[in-house]
Amino acid sequence: MKKLTLSTILALTTLMALGQSDIPRVYEVENTGSQLALPVMPEPDQLPVIHELPDALEGVNSFADWQKRRSDIAHMIQHYGIGEKPAVEPSQVKARMEGDSALVVDVTVNGETLTLRSVINYPKSGQPPYALMIGTSMISLPKQLFENRPIATMTFHESQVNDYSQWRPHHDRGEHNFDRLYPNLVENGAYSEWAWGLSRLIDGLQQLGPEVTKIDTRHIGVTGCSYAGKMALYCGAFDERVALTIAQEPGGGGAAAWRKSHESKENVENIDKTDYHWFLESQREHFKGDSVYQLPYDQHELCAMVCPRALLLLGNPDYPWLADDAMQPSAEAANKVWEHFGIGDRMDLSIIGGHMHCQLPEVQFPIVEKFIDRFLSEK
């Protein structure tokens, strides 16, 4: 069994001048940088070659600078990697509860309506409003991690937005529910659209309020495994209302750096060998092979977008395709952002083998419980 945690390979550097109490754990809005000027996006062939992982902290001298840097990273990832996650006005969202536990959210854009429906499973202990863990496609973490905690759970059914699947019949690109609302974004990858969908569920929870939903929207987590681990990471990175993101075995295109997976001698998921329903086709066109070094960002910066909120990455080295050897340096590079602000303990990595894919071993329970208790239950 291979066991590795970020805390064993990185020394946490605390900035004495900046205490954790000064740094928010979560925000009440989806995107704090929504009013910032958009960065210039050069044509791909005009981008410089960068062999090392790009500096996530470029131009950042203080926490106040991070909002702009984070916004720039978000725009790069959308422009070159996954496609646009469009903003939605509050007036375009109408939420209601059906029965005691079903959240229904109607989103109307350009005269078209998309309906999201998810059942909230309330805990048997504690008092409302409850913290909430949302599973992307499902919650693959063991049920016992939530059964004895005052945390509600809910599934984001991504097929309600974009029904692409590697295992079942699905619509083609441009024919998904999302595309009815945004026909100009038919080239989008699924991850931008799925992140959009989860944000609309949070819109609905906020609109109805804790008196109706029994949910504390300042304590929302998101988790998923494999392709849904990537989904959880994109959802958490692109919505600052998510307090805790747990990406389980997300593989290439998730937390694993594209540059590092390109250099791997193993058969791993890299920028040439991923599923391009998830990403912009233009990403493969412009950044395949050694052209990956012209990508102006890498996946450590997707991870860093979660900062200053909490992020836990879980790996499994028994499945080389997951590219954990590329996730480790990516996580180390991302953690430097949290460390820079004296909050390095809000992010961690745990890579442990000896178990099946998406089956969390008991030896990993403590680190998951630590993050759940600290950032959802605030123990």
Predicted feature descriptions by range:
Residues Q248-L302, A323, M327-A331, E339-G344:
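Mobile cap/lid helix-loop segments that gate and shape the active-site cleft of serine hydrolases
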Residues C307-D325:
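Conserved strand-to-loop "acid loop" that flanks and positions the catalytic carboxylate
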Residues G135-R218, G251-G254, W258-K260:
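Cap/lid segment of the alpha/beta-hydrolase catalytic domain
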Residues R117-I120, P128-S137:
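Short beta-strand element of the alpha/beta-hydrolase
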Residues Q20-G83:
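N-terminal pre-domain segments of enzymes
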Residues E332-K379:
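C-terminal catalytic histidine-bearing segment of alpha/beta-hydrolase fold enzymes
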